[in-house]
Amino acid sequence: MSISQLFILSRRGDSIIYRDFRRDIKKSNDIFFRNVNFFTEEEIAPPLFNVDGINFIYIKTDDLYIAISTLDNSSPNYFLEVIEQLLKVIKDHIGVLTEETIRKNFVLIYEIIDEMIDFGYPQLSDSEQVK
């Protein structure tokens, strides 16, 4: 159950945070954003979808998309839990999660990601362990 890429995008599709763990997929945040925006306001994009063999799992907050891409056909709930735990730890360290706070604290966020996910394999999920 490995993660190929993790990215945080603004609602406009700008890449704020991008980490390629396994280098087995070309940069896929553009593919993700085009497919999420394919849905209309009345329709909601599913939290998991597949494009050309790449699985995208994401959570949308008010202004941000936090997404994982993987080639594994593992449980989507597992990947959603990884995203939830990552968001929780980031919020514990920087407070409110907005595009501005991410840009101001991007070095810290990359350090958190590197502590929690090692070569695409989630390791730590508790704020106390990551500190």
Across the structure, where does each feature detected by a protein language model lie?
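Acidic, low-complexity cytosolic segments
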Residues: 1-131
